[in-house]
C-alpha cells in the first residue's frame, strides 16, 4: 500500500514537472495550488517518473559521451536551526498556556519530525537513494551507446557524505546494469576548487545596499501571517514577546514541505494548516532570494553566476579532451544546488540567464528556481558524432532529464554545435576574468 501511495505521488509530481516545460499558461500560483511540492524550492522532490521522448539526433549522429553535474538526492533537514527556531517559540507559548488546539497539534507533529531527524541532520534519505538510482538507470537506458561494453565512467563527488552516497547509489545501478563498465569513484578536497566553489568575493557582494533595499521591499508584503498567529495561539498578542511571527511562518511552512523527502511524507499536518496563497507567498520570497544570491541580478552587478566559471571551464576542457577519444564514456559529478543553479544561470539554460533589477519581473518572465534544483536535480550534456573523425560534434543539454534551450544560435535545435558553445562560453568567462582583474588592479593602486 505504501508503495502504491508513493507511486501515485510521483505520477502527480511528474505531471506538473513536465507541464512547467511544455506550457506557459500555468502561473506559479496555479502550479502550487495543485502541487505544493513546487513551493519547496530547493527542498522539492525530484519527479523521477516517465519522461517525454527525446528529439532524434540528426542522421548518422550517435551519442558517445556524457558530461554531467547533479545534486544529491532527498535529504533530511540540514541542521537543527530549521527545527529549533519554531519549536522553541511554540514551547515558550505552551509554557504560558497560550497554545490553541491547532498549536498543540503543530508541536506534536514537530516532535515526530525531530525524533525521525535527530542524528540524521543533512543525511541522504532512502528516498534520495532511490532518486539517484532512477536517474542512473534512465541514463543508461536512454544512451546505451555511451555505456556499452567496458566503457569508462568517471564519477566524482564533493566530500559531503550525502553527495558521496548519491554517487554510490548511481554507480551501484550502473554496475548492475552493465558489469563490464570500468567505474572509478572519487571524493577529494583536490576537486573542490571546481566541484563546490563558493567565490568569497562574489558571495560577499551579493546583498548590496541596492539589493537589500529591493529585497526588503519585496518581502515585507509577504513575510507576515496574522492568520497563523490566530490559529496557533489562544491570545496572539500575549505571545508576541516570545514568538516572531515572520520566522514562525517561514520555518513551519518549510518544515511541512520538507517532510515530503522523508518516510513521514504522509504526515502533512504542518503543510495542511497553510493556504495555497500563504505557501505561494513564501515561494515568491524564496525565489527572489535565490535570484539575488545566484542569478544575474543587476542589483549586485549580475555577476553571481560566475561563481561557477571554474566548473564550466573545467567541463569544457574535459569535454575537449574526451572528444579526442574513441570511447570516452561518461564523466559524472555529484554536488549541490548552490552550484547547479548558478551554473544554469551562467550558461543561460531555458532563459535562466535573465538580467533585471526589477524583482517583480522574475515570476512573469519564468525565472522560477524551483524548475532548476529539486533534490536530485541534474544537468546532462549529451554529445553526438558520426565517428571519431567527425569534426562537427553536436550536443544537447538535459535539465532534469528534459531537453533544454541555450542562448546561442543553432540550426539543429535542440542540438547545438560544440565548437559554437565552447567558443562563446570561453570568451564569456575570459571577459569576466579580465573585468575582475581590472577591478582588482584599480583597487590596489
Predicted regions and their residues:
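Bacterial Sec-dependent N-terminal signal peptides
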Residues: 1-28
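Signature for phosphate-centric chemistry
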Residues: 26-152, 158-331, 335-445
Amino acid at each position: 500500500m505504501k508503495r502504491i501511495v508513493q507511486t501515485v505521488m510521483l505520477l502527480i509530481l511528474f505531471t506538473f514537472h513536465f507541464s512547467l516545460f511544455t506550457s506557459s499558461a500555468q502561473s506559479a500560483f496555479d502550479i502550487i495550488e495543485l502541487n505544493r511540492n513546487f513551493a519547496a524550492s530547493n527542498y522539492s522532490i525530484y519527479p523521477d517518473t516517465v519522461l517525454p521522448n527525446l528529439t532524434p539526433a540528426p542522421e548518422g549522429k550517435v551519442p558517445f559521451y556524457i558530461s554531467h553535474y547533479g545534486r544529491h538526492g532527498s535529504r533530511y533537514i540540514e541542521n537543527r536551526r530549521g527545527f529549533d527556531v519554531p519549536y522553541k517559540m511554540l514551547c515558550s507559548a505552551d509554557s504560558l498556556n497560550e497554545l490553541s488546539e491547532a498549536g498543540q497539534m503543530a508541536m506534536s507533529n514537530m516532535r515526530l519530525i525531530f525524533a525521525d531527524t535527530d542524528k540524521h541532520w543533512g543525511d541522504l534519505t532512502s528516498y534520495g537513494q532511490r532518486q539517484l538510482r532512477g536517474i542512473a538507470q534512465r541514463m543508461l537506458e536512454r544512451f546505451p551507446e555511451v555505456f556499452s561494453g567496458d566503457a569508462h565512467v568517471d564519477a566524482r563527488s564533493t566530500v559531503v557524505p550525502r553527495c558521496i552516497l548519491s554517487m554510490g547509489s548511481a554507480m551501484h545501478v550502473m554496475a548492475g546494469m552493465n558489469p563490464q563498465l570500468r567505474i572509478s569513484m572519487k571524493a577529494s578536497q583536490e576537486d573542490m576548487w571546481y566541484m563546490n566553489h563558493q567565490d568569497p568575493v562574489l558571495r560577499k557582494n551579493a546583498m548590496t545596499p541596492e539589493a537589500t533595499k529591493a529585497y526588503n521591499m519585496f518581502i515585507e508584503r509577504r513575510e507576515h501571517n496574522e492568520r497563523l498567529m490566530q490559529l496557533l495561539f489562544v491570545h496572539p498578542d500575549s505571545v508576541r514577546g516570545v514568538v516572531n511571527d515572520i520566522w514562525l511562518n517561514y520555518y513551519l511552512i518549510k518544515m511541512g514541505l520538507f517532510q515530503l523527502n522523508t518516510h513521514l511524507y504522509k504526515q502533512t499536518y504542518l503543510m495542511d494548516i497553510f493556504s495555497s496563497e500563504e505557501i505561494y507567498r513564501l515561494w515568491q520570497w524564496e525565489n527572489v532570494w535565490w535570484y539575488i544570491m545566484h542569478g544575474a541580478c543587476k542589483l549586485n552587478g549580475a555577476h553571481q553566476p560566475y561563481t561557477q566559471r571554474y566548473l564550466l571551464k573545467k567541463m569544457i576542457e574535459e569535454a575537449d579532451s574526451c572528444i579526442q577519444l574513441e570511447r570516452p564514456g561518461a564523466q559524472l559529478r555529484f554536488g549541490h544546488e548552490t552550484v547547479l543553479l548558478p551554473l544554469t544561470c551562467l550558461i543561460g539554460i531555458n532563459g535562466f540567464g535573465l538580467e533585471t533589477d526589477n524583482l517583480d519581473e522574475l515570476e512573469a518572465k519564468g525565472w522560477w528556481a524551483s524548475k532548476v534544483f529539486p533534490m536530485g536535480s541534474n544537468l546532462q550534456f549529451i554529445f553526438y558524432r558520426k565517428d571519431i573523425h567527425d569534426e562537427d560534434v553536436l550536443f544537447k543539454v538535459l535539465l532534469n532529464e528534459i531537453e533544454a534551450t541555450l542562448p546561442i544560435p543553432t540550426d539543429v535545435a535542440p542540438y547545438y554545435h560544440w565548437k559554437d558553445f565552447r567558443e562563446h562560453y570561453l570568451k564569456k568567462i575570459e571577459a569576466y576574468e579580465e573585468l575582475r582583474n581590472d577591478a582588482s588592479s584599480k583597487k590596489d593602486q
